């Protein structure tokens, strides 16, 4: 946690009603059954259900981080200084999580990017990452992996459209998935919009419409991609294979890749351990 305490996921608690707890339990069972079966079942899951499951996790983490921050500020005698951008993201996340208990329709597009890919993982693999400020999440286990940007209006999937087309239907080596994951985590950092939504409550359901991202600023939606910074992200994601930043960006114009060859084609044979 941000206060440097280590806690288990099971120990994270937050308040909810009995009806909500029952809806969460039902959702958890559906996701657990699919995860137990593996990639084929997970890839067939309703994207909204996966979004709800991941949002519940991130929401719980953020909620407990806020409580820890309040305790720290109270102990130091200072007022709580909370990022307004994070507060807006947190508010929208909480509103969309209500789709567990309230019929909700997302107009035009889902508010998230989601990628589910098959991965040749080692037995008992479990790799989880999240980044609270950018609301990005990844998990790798069994024979699959998932990446989700929880509040980007599917923009990161558009940003990575070419590589997603290239790897479609391909089973990834773990180092290939970690490269894909690094690309998403870095692009989520470069994403310079703060998505906002209008909520229309009707007796039947809640309609959620995203505000146009292009209208929010004259700047490009993503900041400029810097290979050195991307290389630093890759170095962190590739720690199990011991690759250094120097090796990764030996050619500063073209960082090393295990996903694509020099012609941009998918690399089918990767001579690296399955970590």
Predicted features by range, described:
Residues 1-39:
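An N-terminal structural lobe/cap that precedes and organizes the functional/catalytic core
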Residues 7, 51-53, 183-188:
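Low-complexity, flexible helical/coil segments
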Residues 12, 49, 134:
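Short, well-structured alpha-helical interface segments that form or flank functional binding sites
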Residues 18-26, 51-90:
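Short flanking/linker segments adjacent to small metal-binding domains or redox-active Cys/His motifs
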Residues 35, 39, 58-62, 74, ...:
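Generic secondary-structure transition motif, activating predominantly at the C-termini of alpha-helices
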Residues 36-51:
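Short microdomains enriched in Cys/His and/or Lys/Arg
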Residues 77-275:
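C-terminal, charged low-complexity interaction regions
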């Amino acid at each position: 946690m941000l206060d440097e305490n280590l806690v288990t996921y099971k120990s994270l608690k937050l308040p909810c009603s009995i009806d909500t707890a029952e809806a969460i339990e039902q959702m958890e069972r559906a996701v657990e059954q699919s995860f137990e079966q593996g990639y084929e079942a997970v890839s067939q899951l309703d994207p909204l259900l996966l979004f709800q499951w991941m949002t519940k996790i991130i929401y719980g983490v953020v909620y407990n981080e806020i409580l820890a921050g309040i305790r720290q500020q109270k102990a130091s005698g200072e007022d709580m200084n909370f990022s307004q951008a994070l507060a807006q993201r947190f508010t929208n996340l909480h509103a969309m999580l209500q789709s567990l208990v309230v019929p909700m329709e997302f107009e035009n597009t889902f508010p998230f990017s989601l990628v589910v890919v098959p991965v040749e993982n080692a037995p008992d693999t479990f790799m989880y990452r999240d980044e609270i400020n950018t609301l990005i999440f990844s998990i790798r286990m069994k024979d699959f992996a998932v990446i989700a940007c929880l509040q980007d209006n599917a923009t990161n999937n558009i940003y990575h459209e070419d590589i997603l087309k290239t790897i479609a239907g391909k089973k990834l080596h773990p180092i290939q998935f970690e490269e894909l994951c690094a690309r998403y985590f870095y692009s989520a950092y470069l994403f310079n919009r703060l998505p906002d939504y209008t909520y229309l409550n009707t007796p039947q359901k809640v309609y959620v419409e995203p505000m146009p991202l292009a209208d929010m600023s004259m700047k490009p939606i993503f900041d400029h991609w810097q290979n050195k910074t991307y290389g630093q992200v890759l170095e962190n994601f590739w720690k199990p294979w011991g690759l250094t930043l120097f090796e990764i960006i030996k050619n500063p114009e073209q960082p090393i890749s295990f996903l694509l060859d020099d012609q941009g084609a998918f690399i089918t044979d990767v001579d690296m351990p399955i970590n």
